[in-house]
Amino acid sequence: QKDLIIKNLDLKKNSVLSQDLEPILETSLNYLDPIKGGYKGSPKFPTFNLYETLLYFYNKTNNKKYLDPVTLLIKQLCSKGIYDHVEGGISRYTVDEDWVIPHFEKMLYDNTQFILLLSKYCKINKDEYFRDKLDQTIQFIKKEFLNKNELLGSAYDADSDGVEGKYYIYNFDEIKDIADIGNYFEIE
């Protein structure tokens, strides 16, 4: 038993808990897209765990180099095509580097991580725009992921009737048929 205790103490010395993570974060920052957010290139996955870590280090150090990438990512996620501006929630990823063209799969896992990061961010940035996206995403999960027994489903498939994104794509005539939207866009 003494050997086991010594072995566990040695493991703790080498664990992530006893290491300085800032050099690792510095390396990670070099891979981030300073203009579009997220990692450079495409496809674009939000990688929430990295951004939660950056937010943690911002709260610990008050160094904006950790907050700025989080702010950029959240702005991109909330304003671009990865976010469903009609029903709320985010898609799994985008196929382009601009966060515009979503892969239409929506996963509970991604949306709960989005909620967690966004709720922590809203404690720092009080802008109602982000709070609205947070609330809309929570409502989306309650409406679309809860079944009649109040159990959560895990994902929405990207395909509808065998076509990726079919559920989300409208043609011109379908848009005209939506109540009052024609007046908004001055469509005749």
Identify the role of each PLM range:
Residues Q1-E188:
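Replace the tail clause
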